[in-house]
Amino acid sequence: IPPDQQRLIFAGKQLEDGRTLADYNIQKESTLHLVLRLRGGMQIFLKTLTGKTITLEVESSDTIDNVKAKIQDKEGIPPDQQRLIFAGKQLEDGRTLADYNIQKESTLHLVLRLRGGMQIFVKTLTGKTITLEVESSDTIDNVKAKIQDKEGIPPDQQRLIFAGKQLEDGRTLADYNIQKESTLHLVLRLRGGMQIFVKTLTGKTITLEVESSDTIDNVKAKIQDKEGIPPDQQRLIFAGKQLEDGRTLADYNIQKESTLHLVLRLRGGMQIFVKTLTGKTITLEVESSDTIDNVKAKIQDKEGI
């Protein structure tokens, strides 16, 4: 076996050519391990968060799993606690070094993953992103406490939003299907939340706890939580005006104890616009099956024509 294809290992360490057996404290009847180096083997470096650099002998064809196993051999860190980063990207276990174009003497970064834990990101309205170490079983209360530890914001002033939904304190991250590296949005709750009322066509009145800064989307999500009505079937009316999703309650001057009206949008309903000769645009809620007579009747209801 040509020397350049031999790698000798003793006590978990690869032996360097210029050193002596005595340097490695190899005594009589010691056992060395011979590993064949495929042509094309190479060295890469791993940098930990503590600043320590580890050198690994690898092949381009090694998978990320293999690399993590080598790190375990050297450092004793279980693979499931290792995250490897290269060129700003987290490396996936089944892929090879070649897949990521990792070449000889490349440097990877090793980040430790807490047991069963994961990282999530929290983005504030100022654009700042906070990184948190969490567990899937953490409640929203726990997450708010972690944010308080990092940022000093009292939990009762925090509102956390994920996938357009405000997260409730007693629920867990798993309940909301929040997974590793998900991004939550943090909105500060101004002291001064308020109650508003939502009246349905059946005459039922729903009470909601809201903030002036809540968007109409948020309000519809709260109605969904209470009543199970999907937001896309809700139309909210205040002072004769249909409220638009991206706007806030403050935009419409909706104050404490205001009453909104909830109209259900039939599945398959749609909005169309009618432009008059004066340039005014009227919005109509219609169904594809509406006749032109129906449409004219709706225009009469709205405009008296």
UniProtKB/Swiss-Prot annotation:
Q: Which UniProt keywords apply?
A: Cytoplasm, Isopeptide bond, Nucleus, Repeat, Ubl conjugation
Under the heading InterPro entries, the entry gives: Ubiquitin-like_dom, Ubiquitin-like_domsf, Ubiquitin_CS, Ubiquitin_dom, Ubiquitin_ubiquitin-like
Q: Does the keyword Repeat apply?
A: yes
> Can you tell me which residues the record assigns to a coiled coil?
none
Instruction: State its location(s).
Output: Cytoplasm; Nucleus
> What positions does the cross-link Glycyl lysine isopeptide (Lys-Gly) (interchain with G-Cter in ubiquitin) connect?
K89
Q: Where's it mainly located?
A: cytoplasm
| UniProt xrefs under CDD domains | Ubl_ubiquitin
Span of domain Ubiquitin-like: 1-41, 42-117, 118-193, 194-269, 270-305
Q: Which GO terms describe its cellular component?
A: cytoplasm; nucleus
Q: Where is this cross-link: Glycyl lysine isopeptide (Gly-Lys) (interchain with K-? in acceptor proteins)?
A: G117
* One Gene Ontology MF term: mRNA binding
Its UniProt miscellaneous note says: For the sake of clarity sequence features are annotated only for the first chain, and are not repeated for each of the following chains.
The record describes the protein's role as: Ubiquitin exists either covalently attached to another protein, or free (unanchored). When covalently bound, it is conjugated to target proteins via an isopeptide bond either as a monomer (monoubiquitin), a polymer linked via different Lys residues of the ubiquitin (polyubiquitin chains) or a linear polymer linked via the initiator Met of the ubiquitin (linear polyubiquitin chains).
**Which family would the database say this protein is a member of?**
Belongs to the ubiquitin family.
Q: What is this protein called?
A: Polyubiquitin
Q: Which organism is it from?
A: Linum usitatissimum (Flax)
